[in-house]
Amino acid sequence: MNIRIPNLCSALALLLSTGILQSCKDNDFSFDNIDATMGLGSEQLELPGNNDTKEIALDDVVNLNNSDFVYIDYNGDYQIKMDGNSQEKATVSIDPFTIKSSPTPAKKILISQGDFEGKLAVLTMSGTTPAEVEDLNSVTCDQNINVTIKVPNTVRCVDELTLSLPSFLLIDHATNDGANLSISNNTISLNNTVAGSHTMVLHVKSIDFKTSSNLGSTSFDKNNHRVRLTAEIYLKGRLSKNNIINRGNLSSISGNATADLTITAATGCFHPVFTFDSFGSVALNNIPDFLSDKSVNMNLYDPHIRLNFNNSLPIAAKVSGRMIARDAQNHAIATVDIPIFTVPTGKSVIVLHKQSETAPQGQTYVTVPGLGNLLKTIPDHIDFVDIKAKADNTQTTEVKLGHDYDMTEQYSFSTPLQLDADAAIAYTDSIDDLNKTVKKLSFKESTVGDPTSIDGSLELEADITNRLPTYLTLTAWGTNLQGDSIPQSQLSVDVDKTVDAASDTQTPATTHLTITIKPQSNDVLHSLEGLQFRFRAAASNGNNAIVGKTINAKKQTITVKNIKLTKTGKLVGNFN
């Protein structure tokens, strides 16, 4: 007599072969060449031979559940990619400041026939710099120094006058009473200057705080944010006899100078701070089943976080932050501190990654060893927060004062599905609706001891050829008609070993696997409605870790060969 046990053998074979895969009931690959007919009447019965499956690729059975962060690329590799929800922007500006002169008494220079000289005026100036200024090399002002010269009426005119100013003042043009003057090396020349008051306007292009001069000094006090400047205007003249009117009382030339310089640009070291609320967030929607089990440890081998920056500040910025993986209730699951990295001027790509390797041209790699912790437990979303972004105060450059400088940032998370040493992904599946078959079957009960005890079992054996770079571990348990788990003490489901991992697709690993299902009584057997399976795919079996291998949907397959189902004990069927 022959009976048919519908789907049991083929389902078990499928489940053995697809440790991280989707439900056997929902897939269309074939088990047509497996004979599922058993005979009754002996202590041991075996399924007839030649029971093999075709190669089963992951893509045949994995359901990505319309995931928006797991996809299969053109090469068949599984990829994880999440884009930030927005572009983040922060703006900095360093305020202009002024350097003003203090009132000083007018200077007088006695004149005489022939040559004469002396200090015509002294500018004493100071100002308060913005807090962002760390050091000053020079400032740009495009402002004027006004110099007044009074020539006494005891002369018709002064034949020659030259005014010398400190070399730290860059004076690019000058006028006297509106007429242009000759200027060379900060020396201004005038000829035939008539008696009376004259106003000279000296246009100051910039001030160099690193140049010394015997006609004055500059200083910058970083701690008190003060600049000070003293500039002497030194006059030399020549008066001929013919231009003297009153030889008895030649008197003197007098003068003073004033300035109110607004600084519009500066060269030096600065530390403006960009203020970001965050660098944004990435969400993980529609998590595939094989990543949703509580036992999943998604410690990826080398996750990459790509940060696209555009920094208009002409200074590189030192940036750091913290990434926090959170669950749906916004509770922190994992936190990773991001060390300081440099964002240069202009557009740049900074890639945070776990492994230490050389970056391709056009990118900068920053190694963050703990980056894999963010996905060990699959979060609802990942936030990039606690951003510190400050200009590098060791760089010397020119900045415009009162000008807005922007930094924009957008980040994405990407990595091939590659497991690190302690990583594991898991999947729970089931075979249901077994009761309509098993309730018709009974094992012969014991004639000694407990009359309800039985000595019978079903044993499934197969050779698993695995091309996946993961070790596959199966655990199983029964469920009753009420959907409750049946204790192992009543229905034991024993899997004898872990399926070995393949080191690469060209070198598959073959493991002989045995599953033994043993009910303790026929009552337990008759209450069996389903079998629950948990499959765990891990990078390590405790010793030999296989890391950094990309999981592939097309090339990495599993084949189940030499499937054998053995019944031990007398089996009684009631098919009335």
Indicate residue ranges for each PLM-predicted region.
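Bacterial Sec-dependent N-terminal signal peptides
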Residues: 1-37
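Extracellular/secretory-pathway and virion-surface proteins
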Residues: 24-576
